Amino acid sequence: MPFLEQPKNLDGSMAGDVGFDPLGLSEIDDLGIDLYWLREAELKHGRVAMLAATGVIWVEGFGPLPGWPEADGRSQMDVFWDAWEEHPNAICAGIVFITAIELISGVATTMGRKTGERAPGDFGLNPLQFEITEELALKEIKHGRLAMWAVMGQIGA
């Protein structure tokens, strides 16, 4: 924004950094929250939102996975409890899996921040050996930001 002062931490060195921070979040350095932590959170939430937006579109277009209940105009929580009754082990396994991912990513984030040897969002998972470029990093940030807005719209609709 032309009338706002550009924050000192947003110097354009990160993908998607255009110096826009009207709330001054990039200047926070208390309680373990710094620019590294904020970028890690933005990437994580963007990735989850991209998956969520795709999942919503999939269910709307093709219906639920075989063996799982259909919403049929009911609230999604009613559908969740129906699924819980039919597939409690699958849901518990999903919760355990998500917990493990959160623990692993939390340790990686904390260690990467302390050592400086790990870029935010980099878990070393690249089985197809894609070349990581600045262009791809920018696309991931932009698509993640758009997906976060899209999921909010899908939930609100």
Where are these regions (language model features)?
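Alpha-helical transmembrane segments and their helix-helix packing motifs
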Residues: M1-A157
